[in-house]
Design a protein with these regions (language model features):
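Secretory targeting and sorting signals
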Residues: 1-28
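Post-signal peptide N-terminal regions of Sec-secreted extracellular proteins
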Residues: 28-137
């Protein structure tokens, strides 16, 4: 009986320690997202034929990815890609654009600190006349 109580006590202690370790990890990832998005640049896209370039920008340790979201209320969409200007004049992901709306989404992932890039943005359709968006990198 004493052995069972000792084992139960040890299991409760381990569970408590594991639970305590999970909260700070969640808080750290939340804090990292806040600091990344907290430094976001506000930009504006006005409709034109073909893509428009923004930048150049240089990545920092604030974000591991290049992220984008639309902040205009009309639920529009924009196509976007990243061009790493010191290495190429083509978009990432085999020169393909990705579609972006109001939720934060990555345009490029796992980008090294100090990398120079431009953001290329184009309209999803002609409704994208005057679109505000944010860029976090």
């Amino acid at each position: 009986m004493t052995r069972t109580r000792a084992l139960a006590s040890a299991l409760i202690t381990v569970a408590a320690l594991l639970g305590a370790g999970a909260a700070p990890a969640a808080a750290q990832s939340s804090a990292a997202a806040t600091s990344c998005y907290g430094g976001a640049k506000n930009l504006n896209y006005r409709y034109q034929e073909g893509p428009r370039e923004y930048g150049p920008f240089t990545t920092s340790s604030r974000c591991g990815d290049i992220n984008m979201r639309l902040t205009t209320d009309d639920q529009g969409f924009l196509y976007a890609c990243v061009v790493f200007v010191d290495h190429t004049d083509k978009c990432n992901h085999d020169n393909k654009y990705s579609l972006h709306g109001t939720p934060w989404a990555t345009v490029a992932t796992e980008v090294k600190d100090g990398t120079r890039f431009v953001l290329r943005v184009g309209p999803y359709d002609t409704d994208a006349q005057n679109v505000n968006f944010q860029l976090a990198y």
